Curated annotation (Swiss-Prot):
Catalyzed reaction equations: hydrogen sulfide + glycine + NAD(+) = ADP-5-ethyl-4-methylthiazole-2-carboxylate + nicotinamide + 3 H2O + H(+)
Signal peptide: none
Gene name linked to the record: thi4
Residues annotated to bind NAD(+): 40, 59-60, 67, 133, 159-161, 179, 226
Pathway(s) the chain acts in: Cofactor biosynthesis; thiamine diphosphate biosynthesis
GO biological process, alphabetically ordered: thiamine biosynthetic process; thiamine diphosphate biosynthetic process; thiazole biosynthetic process
Cofactor entry: Fe(2+)
UniProt-annotated binding residues for glycine: 236
The EC number(s) this enzyme carries: 2.4.2.59
UniProt keyword list: Iron, Metal-binding, NAD, Thiamine biosynthesis, Transferase
Protein task: Involved in the biosynthesis of the thiazole moiety of thiamine. Catalyzes the conversion of NAD and glycine to adenosine diphosphate 5-(2-hydroxyethyl)-4-methylthiazole-2-carboxylate (ADT), an adenylated thiazole intermediate, using free sulfide as a source of sulfur.
Protein name: Thiamine thiazole synthase
InterPro entries referenced in this protein's UniProt entry, alphabetically: FAD/NAD-bd_sf (IPR036188), Thi4_fam (IPR002922), Thi4_prok (IPR022828)
């Protein structure tokens, strides 16, 4: 070994193509597809994958974590309350107690999504960025997977047909947009699905409604995180994230209960 790096262009391309082909062949038929790699989606992915179920997370942007990175108005911290702090501690995330507030903790807004994403990956989940879910597969009155497209192709406005991923269950964890549910409602008006959207901010109400609003809203389709509050007209919360993590965990537990029967 003379210390010279090998960098053959063709070998690089072949390596990427072979690896990508094998990856796609492994994930075109899975147990759960999670749409959106924000706080609730990553949490759900971690708990589902830990139990050995094939889980794929699809994120339109090139980074995961949703709005966590920006903290509160760009300040690099978020707030988490008990008992959601246990979910972050499991991922090795450092938490600081808030003086005078026994139930509240602050966490670094960069460390949280980074470590939570790694925890989901280490558990066995596959996270794909730059992929947008443009439609759902609807068979015999049940969601049976997702229709996917490159986000770059969508942004360019090119008319190129999509591909699909089959799944037993789909989770909409796309945040305020609730985009998967919106798509189902828009394309299938006969189903009578409506998405009223979230209400204005009331942090305590919003936090406490998140787990209650986390549920299966159509056969095979679950909502968690802010998508759950958007679907059920719940309040928004701001830079407090405990409800998001608890919602993701509850969503995973609900699906696990069905799949483990």
């Amino acid at each position: 070994m003379d210390g010279k790096l090998r960098a053959d262009e063709v070998a690089v391309t072949k390596s990427i193509l072979k690896s990508t082909f094998n990856m796609w062949m492994d994930i075109i038929d899975v147990d759960v597809v999670i749409v959106g790699a924000g706080p609730s989606g990553l949490t759900a992915a971690k708990y589902l994958a830990q139990k050995g179920f094939k889980t794929v997370v699809l994120e339109r942007h090139l980074s995961f974590g949703g709005g966590t990175w920006g903290g509160g108005m760009g300040f690099p911290n978020i707030v988490v309350e008990k008992p959601a702090d246990d979910i972050l501690r499991e991922a090795g995330i450092k938490l600081d107690e808030v003086d005078g507030e026994e139930e509240l903790f602050t966490a670094d807004s960069v460390e949280v999504p980074a470590k939570l994403g790694v925890a989901a990956i280490d558990a066995g989940a596959k996270i794909l960025t730059g992929i947008v879910v443009e439609d759902l597969i609807l068979k015999e009155d049940k969601i049976a997977g997702v229709v996917i497209q490159s986000y770059a192709i969508e942004k360019a406005g090119l008319h190129i047909d999509p591909l699909t991923i089959s799944a037993k269950y789909v989770i909409d964890s796309t945040g305020h947009d609730a985009s998967a549910v919106h798509t189902l409602a828009r394309k299938n008006k006969d189903l009578g699905i409506e998405v009223p959207g979230e209400k204005s901010m009331w942090a305590e109400k919003g936090e406490n409604s998140l787990t209650r609003n986390t549920r299966e809203i159509f056969p095979g389709l679950y909502v968690c995180g802010m998508a759950a509050n958007a679907y059920h007209a719940g309040y928004r919360m701001g830079a407090i994230f405990g409800g998001m993590y608890l919602s993701g965990k509850k969503c995973a537990e609900m699906i696990l209960e069905k799949m483990e029967k």
